[in-house]
Amino acid sequence: MSRFAKVERKTKESDIVVELDLDGTGQVSIDTGVPFFDHMLTSLGTHASFDLTVKAVGDIEIEGHHTIEDTSIVLGQALAQALGDKKGIRRFGDAFIPMDECLAHAAVDVSGRPYFVHTGEPDYMVQFTIAGSAAPYHTVVNRHVFESLAYNARIALHVRTLYGRDPHHITEAEYKAVARALRQAVEYDPRVTGVPSTKGTL
């Protein structure tokens, strides 16, 4: 059964198209107009082994925030759609990811009950900016990215930085940890034939 989704969302602030194949091989094409966000979504798709195409046009001349958050909303919706009835999946996943001096952890429950927890980032990341050739990426949006993804995918997602100093490393480790946790959670478990829940539904 194909676990593919294509979701489009158009507002006055952005026009987003996301194509997602959960059973891909990490083939990724990202264009949001925010170079560092492109880099992060490329890492996410690659390390989750998803085939992921994202095309976003937004009001980045004002700021990249709208485009980043709206893209995360659509990505979450695509994930929910691609998961379908969730039969046979592992449901839970988690991963620790080091990046030089930084260590990040993510845990996922494909529960149908959206929830998000984000802890451990240094306070200075609220004001830090990663410059790019076009729109910059403000690391304060990390929380918005993962929260929008979790609530629209209807998953419980916990992301934490255990320690780290460089905002680039912290951000990238968080994205990669989420990617690896998602990869584990959405994989098929050969011992599970139905929905992995005592309720019989997720």
Curated annotation (Swiss-Prot):
Disulfide bonds: none annotated. It is found in: Cytoplasm. The keyword Amino-acid biosynthesis applies. GO terms for cellular component: cytoplasm. Signal peptide: none annotated. Its main location: cytoplasm. The keyword Nucleus does not apply. One of its GO terms (molecular function) is imidazoleglycerol-phosphate dehydratase activity. GO terms for biological process: L-histidine biosynthetic process. Its EC number is 4.2.1.19. Keywords: Amino-acid biosynthesis, Cytoplasm, Histidine biosynthesis, Lyase. Pathway: Amino-acid biosynthesis; L-histidine biosynthesis; L-histidine from 5-phospho-alpha-D-ribose 1-diphosphate: step 6/9. It catalyses: D-erythro-1-(imidazol-4-yl)glycerol 3-phosphate = 3-(imidazol-4-yl)-2-oxopropyl phosphate + H2O. This is Imidazoleglycerol-phosphate dehydratase. The gene is hisB.
